[in-house]
Amino acid sequence: MSYSIGIYVKVEGCGKYVEIAYPEYSSPSYNLGRLFRSCMDWNFKSEEYYRCDYAVERLNKGIKELMYCPKEHLKLNPTLSMGSVASSLDILSSVRECILKQAENIPLECIYMKWE
């Protein structure tokens, strides 16, 4: 099983969201969930939309943690996991870059992301 990460905008007047982009690495394994939550200090929930101004802060924290303290987070990676600290770094960087690319045309506080 894997997550599906998407970037969305909220449709005015109806409270619904429309996917506008997805990162290059948009389907990381569920096995990496504990590692992501730990390094980003973010207990994200599936099915919930998060404003990207907040998400970018958490992604930046996670990227720094994985770059400078990889061994601390490696222990959260399951033994039989397909992921690694390096691939986790690629995933978080991919999500951040996708958000920032959308923010070139849409204000960051108007963009949302979802881990599904």
Describe the role of every protein-language-model region.
Residues M1-L108, Y112-E116:
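Acidic (Asp/Glu-rich) sequence patches and key acidic residues
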